[in-house]
């Protein structure tokens, strides 16, 4: 895992310390790691850079799942991406992982979540009220579903949000795709299970 970078090149939308990240991924490969996952969906901008640097799979962002989800839910439904900031998740982060402008995608930010912004996205508070966060996030998702009745699935872009996936699903009864499901898929790709018994 490589956490959210502290400094971004605003003009290129890539981490200012990209070479450090590349070196880290190479070091992990040298240590025998079979796949690398980053810990911020906004790392989609460096997917190609990191994948080209090593000979193991690199998965930078659950945003990579969006083109597949679009095909799963039918052409009359949309995928709703729940992200830290609707304003910040611009096409620079979408195009590198195959999200095209004509895809039925709704982007909904957590900008109204006071609890999230107190502890993430530059917030300095070190304690996280998980129950309050759950309540705020469910409210954001419920409002999104009311605003966009065509939503057929949700993608939680942030690595902190799978904590609440089951609660969100209970509230809106929709398929939820998140970082943990993404990682489970990756794990099974590089550590295949064995089958036995009557086949």
Describe the residue ranges of each PLM region.
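N-terminal glycine-rich anion-binding loop in soluble enzyme alpha/beta folds
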Residues: 1-19, 85-88, 92-128
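A short, acidic, amphipathic alpha-helical segment used as a generic capping/interface helix at domain edges
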Residues: 133-150, 163
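Short, acidic/small-residue loops that bind anionic groups at enzyme active sites
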Residues: 49-73, 169-187
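Glycine- and other small-residue-rich loops at beta-strand/loop junctions that grip anionic moieties
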Residues: 39, 129, 133, 153-157
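C-terminal functional extensions of proteins
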Residues: 157, 161-163, 177-199
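Conserved beta-strand elements of the Class I
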Residues: 78-82
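Gly/Ser/Thr-rich loops at beta-strand to alpha-helix junctions
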Residues: 35-47, 58-65, 84-88, 157-163, ...
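Metallocofactor- and cofactor-centric catalytic cores in central/energy metabolism, strongly enriched
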Residues: 1-39, 49-51, 144, 150, ...
């Amino acid at each position: 895992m490589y956490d959210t970078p502290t400094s971004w090149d605003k003009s290129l939308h890539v981490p200012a310390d990209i070479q450090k990240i590349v070196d880290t991924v190479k070091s992990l490969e040298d240590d025998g790691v079979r796949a690398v996952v980053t810990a911020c969906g906004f790392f989609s901008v460096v997917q190609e850079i990191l994948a080209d640097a090593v000979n193991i799979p690199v998965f930078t962002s659950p945003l990579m799942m969006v083109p597949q989800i679009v095909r799963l839910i039918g052409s009359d439904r949309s995928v709703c991406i729940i992200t830290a900031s609707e304003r910040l998740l611009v096409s620079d982060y979408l195009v590198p992982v195959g999200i095209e402008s004509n895809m039925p995608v709704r982007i909904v930010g957590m900008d109204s979540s006071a609890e999230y912004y107190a502890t993430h996205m530059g917030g300095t508070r070190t304690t996280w009220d998980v129950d309050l966060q759950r309540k705020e996030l469910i409210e954001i998702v419920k409002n999104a579903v009311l605003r966009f009745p065509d939503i057929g699935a949700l993608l939680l872009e942030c690595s902190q949000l799978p904590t609440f996936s089951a609660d969100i699903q209970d509230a809106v009864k929709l398929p939820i795709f998140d970082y943990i499901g993404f990682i489970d898929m990756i794990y099974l790709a590089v550590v295949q299970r064995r089958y036995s018994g009557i086949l």
